Amino acid sequence: MVTVVYKGFEWDKKKAASNEKNHFITFKEAVSIFSTPHYFRTSFVHKEYQELRYISVGVWQGKEITVIYTLRKKRRRIISARRSRDYEKEHYQDYLRKIGAAR
């Protein structure tokens, strides 16, 4: 396994290539949502791995995207990045309305 480290993030190189092929977004592009003024975050425990994972929804190139990651050694380890599902977009828009930043 080859780990890529980039600005406080990390990811598996093969997983990143697979993600780009399937979802048409690189992990490097996806992490840009964390430098935007507003992104929504929630968490869950992955049943199989018993690991706390985070789901963040933000905007990249004018579209809502979802980034799934976990924390490892003070870095965010990216697991997946993709276009947001409808219910994720709804949660994100609700969050923006709540903080007074609706698009």
Predicted regions and their residues:
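Ribonuclease/tRNase effector modules and their secretory precursors
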Residues: M1-R103
